[in-house]
Amino acid sequence: MWKGRDVISSRDFTRHDLEELFDVAKQMERYAKSRVELLKGKMMGVAFFEPSTRTRLSFEVAMKRLGGDVIGFSGAEGTSVEKGETLADTIRMLDAYSDIIVIRHKYEGAAKLAAEIAESPVINGGDGAFNHPTQAMLDVYTIWREFGYVDGLNIGIVGDLRHARTVNSLLETLVNFDVRVFLISPEYLRPRAETIDYIQSRGMKYSFHNGLEEVIHELDVVYVVRIQKERFLDPLEYEKVKGSYKITLDVLKNAKTNLIILHPLPRVDEIDHKVDATPYAKYFKQAALGVPLRMALIYLILAGP
């Protein structure tokens, strides 16, 4: 059951939950650029304490396409947070005005705290370094829309796998499907041990690789996240590693013809812009699908199936 449910961690959702969400999201695609009065009179409160473009805008557009309204803020500037108001008090006030709340925060556990305080359902729009459940839902939905299925696919995840919360949530979502995951990164940027322990306990098939070119011919999906420059003490070491994980036309010469490339965005330089014009590039479509996916999520939580 989705109605009235909080969305805090990817671990909370089953394959059945995801398949129900995907079915409704596919129906919502017809309304993604129009307006349907399914949630007329409902109010979404957004509390984005961290910068966001795609996540915040897609949630706001999704609510408005459903006929609802949006209040809230992006960044603490100009709010009582600047005066020292606690997160708990901010959530209490937003809860008083809203039927559903979306929060993004730099601290892990912020969304869980909000859910404990608020009477309205709370959706985690990204908190800390490890949780971004709706992005993972979108990622897997995009794969499902492109192939028509998820089971049996080989999925490569490339880049900084330790510090990207999208990677953590994606892995925790993919455990619900029969996939093989190729984790492609420097050894010191592999996912944290807690994540590996979890996917192993769920029986996921996975393997570690130092380079993309050695496995590109096996992959159906390449999911790219940026190498985070700020994690490197030696700039030369960063430049060396960055180049070896960049997606270029040359890297793709041995790829399957039906390979798709995904990226949670924003992109820096980890995908060559020449790749944008190829059939492999699905990251902008992926971003666009964020609206119907989040329309479905909001609708199921507020109205039920």
Swiss-Prot record:
Gene3D superfamilies: Aspartate/ornithine carbamoyltransferase. Pfam families: OTCace, OTCace_N. It is an enzyme of class 2 (transferase). GO terms for molecular function: amino acid binding; aspartate carbamoyltransferase activity. Disulfide bonds: none annotated. The keyword Transferase applies. It comes from Pyrobaculum aerophilum (strain ATCC 51768 / DSM 7523 / JCM 9630 / CIP 104966 / NBRC 100827 / IM2). It catalyses: carbamoyl phosphate + L-aspartate = N-carbamoyl-L-aspartate + phosphate + H(+). Its EC number is 2.1.3.2. Carbamoyl phosphate binds at residues 54-55, 104, 132, 135, 265-266. L-aspartate binds at residues 83, 165, 226. Catalyzes the condensation of carbamoyl phosphate and aspartate to form carbamoyl aspartate and inorganic phosphate, the committed step in the de novo pyrimidine nucleotide biosynthesis pathway. Heterooligomer of catalytic and regulatory chains. This is Aspartate carbamoyltransferase catalytic subunit. The gene is pyrB. Pathway: Pyrimidine metabolism; UMP biosynthesis via de novo pathway; (S)-dihydroorotate from bicarbonate: step 2/3. GO terms for cellular component: cytoplasm. Keywords: Pyrimidine biosynthesis, Transferase. One of its GO terms (biological process) is 'de novo' pyrimidine nucleobase biosynthetic process. Belongs to the aspartate/ornithine carbamoyltransferase superfamily. ATCase family.
